[in-house]
């Protein structure tokens, strides 16, 4: 298909995070691409530990205005939230911060709206100033805390524990993991290595502590464990892998029981 032919077709991408931006930069060479983003920046979900412990560094590399990407120059970006997808008419209804509605037609739809995961990823409609305010609030929570608890021993939890302890050696940083060692599923040498690193940095590791998750998860106060034990901290970081998909705008027929999009192995919608 020629470039001119494909440019007559429109691809709408819902979600301009890491995946949405990457897809948009590739497809804009051949299609009219419209991106829908709840934030005017690419606010990456990567490196939470550095974000909390060294926000100025993190902002330089992981908080980038979408208008700053040259490869998105041909992409029409709507700072809005998707409210409804109508598959019959091939349209997406979006609402911006002024509560103005826009109906956007598409030939192809890419769903890259992501998930909520802990307190640092959400689908709230925010301006650049509101993004900066939220990032600073999260960093200040850690900065002002005397005791920090990280629940979950995966890569995110380990990164948070190490970065926070290195930035604030005076703080008591505790890592709670359900297994014997952090990083379940990783090579045993890697698990042993990071266990030694955490210990050397002064992180208190509590193995065999599976937390009882609450809704909403507390950001401070008491953590309760299945064993009946409990712990108290000034700041709590939940990195247990619980995710909530941002898919309320999609027809129920496209979703599984947990709200995730049902797809084939090719990531096409079933």
Regions found by a protein language model. Name each.
Residues 79-90, 207-220:
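A conserved short coil-to-beta-strand element within the FAD-binding core of flavoproteins
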Residues 94-100, 224-227, 265:
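Short acidic, glycine-rich loop/turn motifs
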Residues 2-76, 162-188:
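Beta1-alpha1 glycine-rich phosphate/pyrophosphate-binding loop at the start
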Residues 128-146, 231-270:
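FAD-site-proximal beta/loop scaffold in flavoenzymes
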Residues 1-10, 72-149, 237-239:
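FAD-binding core/adjacent interface of flavoenzyme oxidoreductases
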Residues 32-35, 74, 125-130, 174-175, ...:
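Preference for well-ordered, secondary-structure-rich cores of eukaryotic proteins
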């Amino acid at each position: 298909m020629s470039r001119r032919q494909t440019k007559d077709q429109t691809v709408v991408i819902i979600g301009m995070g890491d995946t949405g931006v990457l897809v948009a930069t590739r497809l804009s060479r051949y299609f009219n691409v419209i991106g829908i983003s709840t934030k005017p920046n690419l606010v990456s979900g990567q490196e939470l530990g550095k974000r909390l412990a060294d926000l100025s560094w993190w902002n330089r590399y992981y908080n980038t205005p979408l208008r700053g990407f040259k490869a998105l120059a041909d992409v029409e970006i709507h700072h809005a939230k998707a409210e409804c997808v109508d598959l019959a008419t091939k349209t997406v209804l979006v609402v911006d911060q002024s509560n103005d509605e826009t109906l956007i037609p598409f030939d192809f739809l890419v769903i890259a709206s992501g998930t909520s995961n802990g307190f640092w990823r959400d689908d709230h409609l925010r301006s650049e100033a509101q993004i900066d305010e939220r990032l600073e609030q999260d960093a200040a929570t850690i900065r002002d805390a005397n005791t920090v608890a990280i629940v979950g021993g995966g890569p995110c939890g380990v990164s948070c524990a190490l970065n926070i302890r290195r930035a604030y050696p005076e703080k008591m940083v505790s890592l709670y993991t359900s297994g014997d060692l952090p990083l379940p599923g990783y090579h045993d040498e890697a698990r042993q290595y990071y266990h030694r690193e955490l210990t050397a940095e002064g992180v208190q590791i509590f193995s065999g502590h599976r937390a009882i998750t609450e809704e909403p998860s507390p950001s401070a106060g008491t953590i309760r464990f299945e064993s009946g034990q409990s712990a108290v901290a000034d700041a709590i970081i939940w990195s247990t892998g619980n995710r909530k998909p941002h898919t309320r705008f999609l027809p129920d027929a496209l979703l599984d029981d947990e709200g995730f999009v049902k797809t084939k192995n090719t990531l096409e919608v079933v």
